[in-house]
Design a protein with these regions (language model features):
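Conserved lysine of the Walker
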Residues: 33-34
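Interdomain motor-coupling "hinge/lid" segment immediately C-terminal to the ATP-binding subdomain
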Residues: 114-229
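Hydrophobic anchor at the beta1->P-loop junction of P-loop NTPases
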Residues: 25
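Domain-level recognition of nuclease-like catalytic cores that cleave nucleotide substrates
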Residues: 402-424
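N-terminal pre-Walker A segment at the start of P-loop NTPase domains
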Residues: 1-14
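Accessory nucleic acid-recognition modules appended to NTPase machines
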Residues: 184-358
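Short glycine-rich substrate-engagement loop in P-loop NTPases that contacts/grips substrate
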Residues: 45-73
Length: 424
């Protein structure tokens, strides 16, 4: 890439390097981990350099310390190819007694973790990178700051320049750094290429087990149809069998989903468990999401025009895009993103909960007055359920929209914010 676009993870990486001897950057292939780490590295070891790959792996077995020589911070790219390096780095960090020594990047969890005997607690810290948010790719004006909403700002203003057609394109293009400056039609090809690579090779890297590409495709299609749903593996198996006429066992679904998780293609969302005024059963299962909406679009074989003609599917994939962006922003604020749903049917699409105890409630709606009103009503009923004697009241309620030219605060205090105006 000619020009490095600043990432939200840049500042997080610097902060983490100040506090620990080694930082492990994880995330999907193509999301920019190596490029981000290269910006601060004083020396670099590319484990998968074709000319040196076998030599590097052999050296990691015989004399791993040799590979760690170099100015700090030393970047070790695709470290998972040589899991023995983990213990060697832990040992080296212990003996140097300094922070900021190593940055490791990896697009998969090591297929064989038997070589790792220590957890790395106290020496390593983790950083998850995802594809770019709209703010990072230059598609959001960034005039509304999420941090300001947590600090209690009352008025907001911000414009969004995204038309419905442009938004459909951005869902299908995804946040892959390489595609941001490409012509639109070429950019759309890249998500399909990414999907093909997952189906035919990347998913096998996760556990060194060859998988049936046709089954992988069908499972990924089912996963795409269930974005934002709390769907167990049994239901995914039934969905594949019913719609694809290809029987698949629950065990196979579990193995394939686990492999997709290990290569960071899926990132499911945990349930939020607040203190409530009255007892109700909270649904504790995770919510299904791809790490980027473009993977879901590719798995369904659809493009921007298809989304415009099928607003229901567009709504689901728009939610995946918003969750991606909120996760990127939450990381910068020391927060996590959760989902809430209970047996009474009360739901909240996203809850950003910060480490300091503050939290915000968010409903995601593609747009239009009717849907925005639905979102506001849901947020207000969710707020009323929370027992504020036992926990803080929410810092804000927000309807996050796709369409709409500007952000504003309603008279009832709810923020309405287009995703094309938001930043961390």
């Amino acid at each position: 890439m000619k020009n490095y676009r600043k990432r939200i993870a840049d500042d997080i990486l610097m902060r983490k390097l100040e506090g620990k001897g080694a930082v492990l950057i994880e995330g999907p292939k193509w999301c920019g981990k190596t490029t981000t780490a290269e910006q601060i590295a004083a020396s670099i070891l590319y484990m998968d350099d074709p000319e040196k790959k076998e030599q590097n792996i052999t050296m990691s077995e015989l004399n791993p310390k040799r590979l760690l020589k170099g100015a700090a911070p030393r970047l070790i790219d695709e470290w998972q190819l040589a899991p023995k390096l983990w213990d060697a780095i832990r040992f080296e960090v212990d003996h140097r007694g300094e922070t900021g020594q190593f940055v490791l990047t990896g697009s998969a969890v090591p297929a064989d973790t038997r070589e790792i005997t220590h957890s790395g607690t106290g020496r390593f810290t983790w950083l998850t990178m995802r594809p770019m948010s709209l703010y990072e790719s230059g598609d959001s004006t960034g005039e509304v700051c999420l941090a300001d909403l947590f600090s209690g700002t009352s008025e907001i203003e911000g414009d969004s320049n995204l038309s419905i057609d442009r938004l459909a394109f951005l869902v299908c293009r995804g946040g892959w750094p390489q595609v941001v400056d490409m012509r639109d039609e070429i950019a759309l090809d890249q998500a399909m290429d990414y999907y093909d690579a997952v189906v035919h090779s990347d998913i096998n890297r996760a556990d060194n087990v060859q998988k049936n590409p046709e089954r992988v495709k069908r499972l990924m299609r089912s996963y795409a149809r269930n974005q934002g749903g709390q769907v167990p593996n049994t239901v995914l198996a039934q969905d594949v069998a019913a719609s694809e006429e290809m029987p698949i066992s629950e065990e196979t679904v579990a193995a394939y989903v686990s492999a997709l998780r290990k290569i960071f293609v899926v990132e499911d969302m945990p349930a939020w468990n607040p203190n409530l005024r009255s007892k109700t059963a909270i649904r504790s299962s995770d919510t299904r999401y791809y790490i980027d909406p473009s993977i879901a679009a590719a798995a369904l074989g659809i493009g921007p025009d298809d989304l415009i003609n099928d607003l229901k599917t567009f709504g689901f994939l728009f939610e995946t895009l918003c969750i991606r962006d909120l996760r990127v922003f939450a990381d910068a604020l020391n927060g996590e993103v959760y989902h809430y749903r209970d047996k009474d049917g009360q739901e909240c699409d996203a809850v950003i909960h910060l480490r300091n105890g503050k939290y915000g409630l968010i409903e995601i709606k593609l747009g239009g007055d009717k849907l925005i009103e639905e979102g506001v009503k849901s947020l207000k009923s969710m707020e009323a359920k929370i027992d504020t004697d036992k926990m803080n009241a929410p810092s804000f309620l927000m309807v996050l929209t796709g369409t709409g030219d500007y952000a504003y605060r309603r008279q009832d205090g709810v923020y309405v914010v287009p995703i094309g105006s938001l930043k961390n």
